[in-house]
Curated annotation (Swiss-Prot):
Annotated Low complexity bias: 356-376
One GO cellular component term: cytosol
Modification Phosphothreonine occurs at: T276, T297, T514
UniProt-recorded name of the protein: Uncharacterized serine-rich protein C18E5.07
Organism, as annotated: Schizosaccharomyces pombe (strain 972 / ATCC 24843) (Fission yeast)
Pfam assignment, any one: Aim21
Basic and acidic residues: compositionally biased ranges: 312-323, 586-599
Keywords from the named record: Phosphoprotein
Positions carrying Phosphoserine: S149, S152, S219, S275, S516
Length: 615
């Protein structure tokens, strides 16, 4: 090649490759000029190309290779035929929710791949970027001169090129079937293809040479003269533009002093006024009157507002949790007490709990909690079941007669409902019975199956804690529990709507009384403190929080808000397979079944021990 380069005159190469062509190709980095035989030639040595009439710039990499590589990238090179136009690349799938963006605005020259996998695009870009002059869109079989590459899989050659997706995101004009030229002004239209524009975006057009100041002051649709002095075609003024122009003209005239604007100190005619006073229910759409249909009294200026006073909480349309209620004012829907729902405790129930019972009952739980951590999942399930049965069987106003059977039921009932309805006198009666399990530790309590006394006793104290503390072992589904109670709550709400309570989340992160003995005492103390503070705070609504500011978000969920009964995948994964392995080895399996010394239902325990003996 070096010899030929020395022989061939510089002029010859200039004739062969006109500047315009070379320029048009320049943005494809690895592109060379290819002679008629299909071999790449360097710019200097073009002796061979003189014989050919025209020199066509072509990609260095033959198109079949590009197609093959692209196919392998997109479809993993599999050999079966795919309808190429309908198969989405994984990249297209990635981006598919944004397709309308990519195709329509500002990105016309850019392939979809660019934002997702900028480098993956290198090969593909060769085909269509800049000048597609030499790269034929004809089916590869038509170019006989090119040898098809060894790379390409036969299945990937595009048999129907017109149906193949164009690689660059300029969509075809459906009418012409051609790639439209795109003028920069049109880029921001939201159109799927670039139309011939009769109406230009007059904002982005260049001004004609003779433009005068008044032309500039007109609204965008006023006629602008083009260089010939003729009026440009442009979109007819839209109705708002006319109004706008009239107003502008009025203002300009008023400034000049030609015609004064009519001006009165009177605001609007009474019938056109929208006053605060006479809003009716029909105005309530979109929360305009925020639930008040009664006229708002005018401000009396003689009254001073004393700074200490706390404004009455405004009624708004949003529930504490931020769902919009369907147009019902706050005091009907605000914070319903749904029976058995104890996730967020009201200040009322907290006040009820602080009493002699709390201090007395918390001690045993703290002492014995070393032996027991939270009752096992099975226990919790039973809890839920009993809860549901109990609450379904009982009429809403609950008699206090429950205190007696509690020892048989095993204290599984959700006690807070009882406590809420009972008076402090009854609470003091409860506290001795709560301490019972501690004193009678060795005797098997009367459960249905007293098979394993130690375990039953280890379950007891945590129940005692449950009775005395505002923490609940089980949070059943929001609407579980007596339906009647729910309706009753609704109806009582309808008669006397309480003001909105500002919601104070429970400060103690750990469920109290269940942790290790050391943490048990501290958490009890903490609970007492928070209870006293919250009861004093929530008596008066906080002035800052009482304004209704649209949907209030619920505070971030803390440990005690989460349902305490949940099986995570990891628990299952860790416990079950391990236990089976241990069984095979013949090792005692009790540890596996009961990893944290949790309480286990007696029947199951017996079965497990039997199994180990057999093996």
């Amino acid at each position: 090649m070096s010899e030929t380069s020395s022989n061939s005159p510089a002029s010859g190469s200039k004739e062969a490759v006109p500047k315009s062509l070379a320029g048009s190709t320049s943005n494809i980095p690895n592109e060379l000029f290819v002679g008629p035989d299909g071999r790449p030639l360097s710019q200097n040595a073009q002796g061979a190309s003189k014989s050919s009439s025209k020199v066509v710039p072509q990609a260095l990499v033959p198109e079949d290779d590009i197609r093959a590589v692209e196919g392998i990238l997109n479809y993993g090179g599999s050999n079966d035929n795919r309808p190429v136009s309908h198969t989405h690349t994984f990249v297209e799938l990635q981006k598919s929710h944004q397709n309308h963006l990519t195709e329509n605005d500002r990105n016309f020259g850019t392939s979809r791949l660019d934002d997702v996998a900028p480098n993956a695009d290198g090969v593909r870009r060769l085909r269509t970027s800049g000048s597609s002059t030499g790269l034929s869109n004809a089916p590869p079989s038509a170019n006989v001169s090119k040898a098809s590459s060894n790379l390409s899989l036969a299945s990937l050659a595009k048999t129907q090129p017109e149906r193949a997706t164009p690689e660059v995101c300029v969509p075809l004009n459906p009418d012409t079937g051609s790639v439209p030229l795109i003028h920069p002004e049109q880029t921001d239209r939201g159109l799927p293809y670039a139309p011939d524009e009769k109406f230009h975006n007059s904002g982005s057009l260049k001004l004609p040479k003779g433009a005068s100041l008044e032309d500039l002051s007109r609204s965008p649709s006023r006629a602008v003269l083009n260089e010939d002095g003729n009026v440009d075609e442009c979109a007819p003024p839209e109705p708002w533009e006319n109004e706008y122009n009239e107003v502008l003209d009025d203002v300009e005239n008023a400034v000049v002093g030609t015609s004064p604007l009519e001006y009165t100190s009177k605001p609007l005619a009474a019938n056109r006024q929208r006053s605060t006073a006479d809003l009716t229910e029909s105005d309530n759409i979109c929360g305009l009157t925020a639930g008040k249909s009664d006229p708002v009294t005018d401000v009396d200026e003689s009254q001073t507002i004393d700074e200490q006073s706390i404004p009455e909480a405004e009624k708004g349309f949003y529930t504490k949790d931020g769902e919009g209620t369907a147009g019902l004012p706050f005091d009907i829907v605000s914070n319903l007490d749904i029976p058995n729902e104890n996730a967020h405790e009201s200040s009322r129930s907290k006040k009820k709990h602080t009493g002699p019972s709390l201090s007395s009952a918390s001690q045993p739980s703290a002492a014995s909690s070393s032996s027991s951590s939270e009752p096992s999942n099975l226990d919790k399930i039973n809890d839920v079941k009993k809860n549901i049965e109990v609450s379904a069987n009982e009429p809403q106003p609950r008699p206090v007669k429950e205190d007696v059977p509690k020892s048989q039921v095993g204290g599984e009932t959700d006690t807070t409902d009882v406590i809420n309805n009972s008076t402090p006198k009854e609470e003091t009666e409860e506290s001795p019975s709560t301490e019972l399990p501690e004193t009678g530790k060795e005797q098997p309590p009367n459960k249905a199956e007293p098979a394993v006394p130690t375990e039953a006793s280890s379950t007891k104290p945590s129940e005692a804690a449950e009775e005395s503390t505002p923490r609940f072992s089980v949070r059943p589904n929001k609407f579980t529990g007596s339906r009647a109670g729910f309706v009753a709550a609704l109806e009582s709400r309808l008669q006397k709507g309480p003001l909105m309570r500002s919601f104070v989340p429970n400060k103690s992160k750990s469920p109290s009384g269940t942790k290790s003995p050391a943490s048990g005492e501290t958490s009890e103390a903490g609970v007492k403190e928070t209870e006293t503070t919250t009861s004093s705070e929530s008596a008066l609504p906080d002035a800052r929080k009482s304004r209704a500011r649209g949907p209030v978000r619920r505070p971030p969920t803390s440990v005690n808000t989460k349902p305490s009964f949940s099986v995570s995948g990891i628990d299952v994964f860790l416990n079950l397979p391990q236990s089976s392995v241990m069984k095979k080895k013949g090792v005692e399996t009790r540890k596996e079944v009961e990893p944290k010394e949790e309480a286990v239902i007696p029947e199951e325990d017996v079965e497990v021990e039997v199994e180990t003996e057999e093996q």
